[in-house]
């Protein structure tokens, strides 16, 4: 039932994007001392939504639904200043990005919970 609501699909896509972004950030932190490693990040969720191929809609039951933007399309290089060993991972920057991704994920979950509560209340189920 919830997957038919645009708001919940958007919240699910935001949660998936945030999870993918956290995985990229974790990979950056894990390679902070690897010589020659270049830090990467995900493109902004809003930018991924603005892509024309993401706006596909299912108009008939036989159509396959898209789960949202493809996280692999959003990878970009985004490091800090280059160190002598060719590594550009800034741990401070990665921690800041991790906090942003966590906040986005929490916002997506809050939207999903609020939508669920509204639907339950409208159906007369207060639990």
For every predicted segment, state its role:
Residues 1-127:
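Amphipathic alpha-helical polymerization modules
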């Amino acid at each position: 039932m919830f997957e038919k609501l645009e708001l919940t699909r958007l919240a699910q896509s935001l949660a998936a994007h945030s999870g993918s972004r956290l995985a990229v950030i974790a990979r950056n932190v894990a390679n902070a001392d690897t010589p020659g490693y270049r830090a990467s990040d995900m493109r902004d969720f809003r930018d991924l939504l603005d892509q024309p191929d993401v706006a596909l809609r299912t108009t008939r039951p036989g159509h396959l639904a898209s789960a949202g933007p493809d996280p692999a399309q959003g990878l970009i290089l985004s490091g800090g200043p280059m160190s002598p060993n060719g590594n550009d991972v800034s741990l401070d920057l990665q921690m800041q990005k991790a906090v942003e991704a966590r906040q986005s994920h929490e916002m997506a979950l809050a939207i999903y919970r609020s939508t669920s509560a509204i639907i339950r209340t409208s159906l007369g189920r207060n639990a």
